[in-house]
């Protein structure tokens, strides 16, 4: 058992709250004296995260330190469930200090379009509701980093995807990771097949998926259900109790809302795992 380091001057009330929290993955709820929710967050380590809120000198944290009365929490075991739950709880409860997160945060998206030479180019642009997006991002930099990894993973061309500005062949071609779309050497049909593979692997549309992850204890697993491309919810199950089919899972499912944010959170998770 490790006592949390407290900075000099942390009020005993705050210290007591920190000491009562687990060093586990989950979502936490900060309440004021009236019982109103003033902030919701998620963390890989709830205890550490609350300790940061209570010792930080930024103005939002100082307001939280003055107003906090209790902190409740829910362990999720899975980081993905914590992210999804945080997103939904903020939308429903609209806590005063979560203002920024109430709005949809993903303002950049990945789009595909055929270029003049017949190759399908992928590009990151400001979100445009009229166009069909493949996935979305919180920042332009996150989008560019993802596009870079996608281009590498699927042997696509940096020049076609607008990452490498050149009149000649792209850098990936010089090290044999691109098959020459940049200089018209690879036939567009072959190239576009790999782009379609990427889109297929990253699109939920009509897909049925069960994402299995860690549970809250060693003997437990968590599962997230996506049915026909729609995020349905999550559940926890005992390792000794096999979930043999989707119907069994649906009986213990905690239903959740499906929206653009949940789709983006799940896609981001799939990209990284």
For each of these PLM feature ranges, what is it?
Residues 1-273:
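Acidic, glycine-enriched active-site microenvironments
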């Amino acid at each position: 058992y490790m006592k949390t380091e407290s900075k000099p001057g942390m009020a005993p009330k705050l210290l007591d709250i920190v000491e009562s929290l687990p060093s586990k993955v989950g979502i936490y709820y900060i309440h004021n004296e009236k019982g109103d929710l003033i902030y919701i967050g998620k963390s890989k380590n709830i205890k550490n995260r609350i300790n940061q809120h209570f010792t930080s000198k930024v103005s939002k944290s100082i307001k939280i330190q003055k107003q906090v009365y209790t902190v409740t929490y829910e362990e999720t075991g899975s980081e993905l469930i914590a992210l999804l739950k945080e997103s939904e709880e903020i939308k429903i409860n609209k806590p005063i200090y979560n203002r920024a997160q109430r709005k949809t945060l993903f303002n950049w998206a990945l789009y595909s379009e055929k270029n003049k030479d017949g190759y399908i180019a992928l590009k990151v642009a400001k979100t445009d509701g009229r166009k069909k997006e493949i996935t979305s991002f919180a920042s332009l930099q996150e989008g560019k980093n993802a596009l870079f990894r996608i281009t590498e993973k699927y042997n696509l061309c940096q020049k076609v995807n607008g990452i490498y500005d050149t009149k000649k062949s792209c850098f990936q071609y010089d090290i044999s990771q691109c098959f020459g779309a940049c200089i018209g050497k690879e036939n567009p049909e072959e190239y576009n097949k790999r782009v379609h593979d990427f889109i297929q692997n990253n699109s939920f549309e009509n897909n049925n998926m069960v994402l299995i992850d860690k549970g809250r204890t060693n003997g437990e697993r968590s599962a997230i259900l996506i049915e026909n491309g729609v995020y349905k919810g999550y559940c926890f199950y005992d390792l000794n109790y096999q979930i043999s089919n989707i119907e069994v899972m649906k009986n213990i499912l905690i239903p959740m809302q499906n929206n653009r944010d949940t789709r983006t959170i799940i896609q981001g998770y799939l990209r990284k795992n």
